Amino acid sequence: MLNTDLRILKPYYITTAIDYTNAPPHIGHAYEKVLADVMARFQRLNGREVFFLTGVDQHGQKVQKSAEKAGVSPREFVDGVTEKFVSLWAKLGVHYDGWAATVDEKHKRVVQAMLQKLHDKDQLYKKSYAGFYSVRQEQFLTDKERGADGSFGEEWGEVVELQEENWYFKLSEHIEWLRGFIKSHPDFIFPTFRANDVLNALDGGQDLCISRPKERLSWGIPLPFDDRFVNYVWFDALVNYISFAGFLADEVGNENMPDFKKIWPADAHVIGKDILVPAHAIYWPIMLHAMGFSDDEMPRLIVHGWWNVNGVKMSKTLGNVVDPNNVADIVTPDGLRYYLMRDMTTGYDADLSDERMMIAYNKELAGGLGNLLNRALSMAQKYRTGLLSQNSGYDDEVNQSLRATVAAAPAAYFEKMNAWSIHEGIAEAWKIITHANQFVDITAPFKLAKDEAQAARLDSVLYHLAEALAHVSVLLSPIIPEACVKMRAQLGWQMPDGFQVSDLKWGLLNDGHQLGQPVPLFPRLELATTEAK
């Protein structure tokens, strides 16, 4: 028996990286947020309370420079870019429970309280440093970042020499703890092979500069014990995962916050592979460890890959950055969600392809799912005025085979989805669609309708098709939520409140159930380019 009741567990706390507000969103941002939204919806579909946090990273040197270039204040600049992210998430159906904005005073209070606590614990100290600094990545560089020829790679952008005094966090004191933690907690990072990247990066670990002088960077959170400096943007940004989850809320006076003890640790920090090392896999767990968090209170990192275009990483220089707004306008928001989840294996890179996207839309969504729904409803309306007969008295091996496929899907779907194998979860649901389309071809309802002696068999065929589609509308609801709502409306069936995957049993549609009229779910599209130069 399928056991997917997760209500006995703590609330599922899932976060994404907060997006840097120096530029508008691209397809990589969209993938990450849709991935997290799909998992949040899946967990809710299994009876679990969920807190889904996403947001924007609004401080830092890149923002300050972008604002200066645009001739506006940093706050005005980030507000404008933030609105683009908010509007895109609404368009794509990304339904979050908490919004993290690092200019929020609630966040600032927690960051400053943490800094003060670390200072009081003698975890911070001030020293002078002379060396190289990456303007793009907003961090100091060491010889470890040099290539074989002694130069710094393109990923660092403009590199300048700096000599200045700053505050440092005693990161190196905790390196051996982190090494042991990673080795003894294989579930800390998914996929597990990414752990080797982290372990390799721990050798020769140095302390972390956590400040920038105000004379160079004014757009940031001031250090509570030395207001000549602002906090390093990565330290500030990482704290969002706990500041907006209610950490220190009572102590700093933050009201209307989640119950931190109830939802922490995070079940999933969904991030890109480019920010695993050093930020999320080194800085963040060590920051928590230094604050007194136990090993059992460490979050889990879910690391996804990159979307490339024709095998090449997206970049402004190459002009191949894809705008998700434009793509969603072409293939619909659900069409984009489906393609992103279908064509990427969580943790690995994928290639964005116009051709594959159109195949996914036209062949699978329109031709597979949409056409099945249209045929099932049209035949039911034509032959039975949309009324279903659950107890026709007819059964055969063809019916039984379809019922077996429908019955097997929930457990396999749950296993794949719960393991972050979203594309395989989709495939398990799609087995019903494929089988149901074959079922139509085998049973040929239009022929049965011509023979009154086959009336009971026709009733059973029409019921089996509608019932199978009701199951599909549940399983695919985390992936294509808007389309599934439309499916259920056309089927004349609404999921009861609290309905779970484990409630999927044959007989969702009662005897005498009235189906609605068919409306194209995914109208076919002409081949179009989705690249936005």
Where are the regions a protein language model picked out?
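Structured secondary-structure scaffolds
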Residues: 2, 7-47, 51-54, 106-110, ...
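Conserved, charged catalytic cores of large soluble enzymes
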Residues: 2, 7-21, 38-210, 247, ...
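Basic, alpha-helical terminal appendages of large translation-related enzymes
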Residues: 2-11, 25, 51, 55, ...
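Generic structural marker for isolated residues within well-ordered, non-membrane alpha-helices
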Residues: 63, 82-85, 284, 324, ...
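Short, mixed-charge aromatic SLiMs
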Residues: 139-143, 268, 307-312, 363, ...
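Short, charged/polar, low-complexity loop and linker segments
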Residues: 349-354, 407-415
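Generic structural concept
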Residues: 366, 370, 403, 407, ...
